[in-house]
Amino acid sequence: MEPNGTVHSCCLDSMALKVTISVVLTTLILITIAGNVVVCLAVSLNRRLRSLTNCFIVSLAATDLLLGLLVLPFSAIYQLSFTWSFGHVFCNIYTSLDVMLCTASILNLFMISLDRYCAVTDPLRYPVLVTPVRVAISLVFIWVISITLSFLSIHLGWNSRNGTRGGNDTFKCKVQVNEVYGLVDGLVTFYLPLLIMCVTYYRIFKIAREQAKRINHISSWKAATIREHKATVTLAAVMGAFIICWFPYFTAFVYRGLRGDDAINEAVEGIVLWLGYANSALNPILYAALNRDFRTAYQQLFHCKFASHNSHKTSLRLNNSLLPRSQSREGRWQEEKPLKLQVWSGTELTHPQGNPIR
């Protein structure tokens, strides 16, 4: 009886673990899809968000949405069964989509950091530096790199050790990695963007602190300290999430290229892979919900008040415009909120004339 009881207990533990993993992966997929759908809807329904700055956020949301729809369901099935049941041809398509969309997601994050670096370090020349043509070129660059490292490399066998497409085991489906592909993909997709993002966000943080000190004479010391704290927390969340989610995966990826595809345990490989996928679920929160305009759009979206809000805002502007300048200045400051270059970090920029931009 004892051996049978032990086997039964192991089966129950295995089933409980599989159910737990299924719930976690399903929740992650639903959050990824729902969060990025909300970002796309917010931009499509709110004209205020249709700006060049938000082009990269929309591109990021669309990329992560495609990842949640086209890749994550098959990854979850494979993770739970440890068996690929969809054939060799679809395996190549699946792995190519996986690499392409993950690469595009990371490169979009990289472009967002460069965009905000230009906005903070040189706000007066920002409209000259960031033009529709340059944004379009940047988006084309993202997808050219992503397609080259995914569909082109995998279907031509550049990533495999023997130069063939796909592996020999028809019941397994994962990206093969040789030395050159592992190093090139790791550097282009993660390590170089990570280095540049660290530099840009450090510069943004320094400027945010300087601005907080500069407006210290206008507002209380406590308010300036709170603004600086918010900027620190936001930047730490953005970089922390990116590093925690992707660093383990690309470390394992490069290690596989150097040591062989079977150098890492499948369970560990699955954990670091889904940790990277989790970044696509966090992006709508980190890059949209922390932005004041996006938060307002989310509230409007969930309460279905786009029309009433816009009409109310228009009436306020018309009423303020009819008042004398001396009488309407304070009301316009609170209600109208003129066109601004908002930095998502939560720290206020300073207008050339000395007025803070909220």
From Swiss-Prot:
InterPro entries: GPCR_Rhodpsn, GPCR_Rhodpsn_7TM, Histamine_H2_rcpt. The record marks 98 as: Essential for histamine binding. Residues 45-57, 115-134, 204-233, 289-358 are cytoplasmic. GO terms for molecular function: heterocyclic compound binding; histamine receptor activity; neurotransmitter receptor activity. GO terms for biological process: cellular response to histamine; chemical synaptic transmission; digestive tract development; epithelial cell morphogenesis; G protein-coupled receptor signaling pathway, coupled to cyclic nucleotide second messenger; gastric acid secretion; gastrin-induced gastric acid secretion; gland development. The record marks 189 as: Implicated in histamine binding. PROSITE patterns: G_PROTEIN_RECEP_F1_1, G_PROTEIN_RECEP_F1_2. Residues 1-22, 82-92, 160-179, 258-266 are extracellular. It comes from the Eukaryota. The chain crosses the membrane at residues 23-44, 58-81, 93-114, 135-159, 180-203, 234-257, 267-288. A lipid is attached at residue 304 (S-palmitoyl cysteine). Belongs to the G-protein coupled receptor 1 family. This is Histamine H2 receptor. The lineage of its organism: Eukaryota, Metazoa, Chordata, Craniata, Vertebrata. The gene is Hrh2.
